[in-house]
């Protein structure tokens, strides 16, 4: 417990909040190039083949990013835009690829929640 005199001399240091997405370097999104596109399995108790990509970012980092939605057209050397946001059942995946921008096409035949998957509004028949 510091004395009042010690507190006058030097104030209490503020606790620094650690960022959950350091590779973005305080930016909302970052551009990057896919170095590897593959599937991985989630933690227990879930079971699936989740689509992920290793992305080399313009900030110099190489991160693992999740590819949301059903089906994708990404391959090695695809240019993608990533945002923060982890995938709870995939350890080490702290970023999402934004669908419908750069080389990542939107999800085909999506009717609901289209804005999250980069899908245009369907034409009225």
UniProtKB/Swiss-Prot annotation:
Keywords of this entry: Methylation, Ribonucleoprotein, Ribosomal protein, RNA-binding, rRNA-binding, tRNA-binding
Full protein name: Small ribosomal subunit protein uS12
PANTHER family linked: 30S RIBOSOMAL PROTEIN S12 FAMILY MEMBER
GO cellular component, one term: small ribosomal subunit
InterPro entries, per database record: NA-bd_OB-fold (IPR012340), Ribosomal_uS12 (IPR006032), Ribosomal_uS12_bac (IPR005679)
Cross-referenced Pfam families: Ribosom_S12_S23
Assembly mode: Part of the 30S ribosomal subunit. Contacts proteins S8 and S17. May interact with IF1 in the 30S initiation complex.
Presence of keyword RNA-binding: yes
Modified residues (3-methylthioaspartic acid): 89
Disulfide bond keyword on record: no
Source domain of life: Bacteria
Native source organism of the sequence: Rippkaea orientalis (strain PCC 8801 / RF-1) (Cyanothece sp. (strain PCC 8801))
Entry GO MF terms: rRNA binding; structural constituent of ribosome; tRNA binding
Family the UniProt entry places it in: Belongs to the universal ribosomal protein uS12 family.
Designated gene of the protein: rpsL
HAMAP family hit by this protein: Ribosomal_uS12_B
GO annotation, biological process: translation
Listed CDD domains: Ribosomal_S12
Region named Disordered: 9-28, 104-125
Biased composition (Basic residues): 113-125
Function noted in UniProt: With S4 and S5 plays an important role in translational accuracy.
């Amino acid at each position: 417990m510091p004395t009042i005199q010690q507190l006058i001399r030097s104030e209490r240091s503020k606790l620094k909040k650690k960022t959950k997405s350091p590779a973005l370097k305080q930016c909302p999104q970052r551009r990057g190039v896919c170095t590897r596109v593959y599937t991985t399995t989630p933690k227990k108790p879930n079971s699936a083949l989740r689509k992920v990509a290793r992305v080399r970012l313009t900030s110099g980092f190489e991160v693992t990013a999740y590819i949301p939605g059903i089906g994708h057209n990404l391959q090695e050397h695809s240019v993608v835009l990533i945002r923060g946001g982890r995938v709870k059942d995939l350890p080490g995946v702290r970023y999402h690829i934004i669908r419908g921008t750069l080389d990542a096409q939107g999800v085909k035949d999506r009717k609901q929640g289209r804005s999250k998957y980069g899908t245009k509004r369907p034409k009225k028949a």
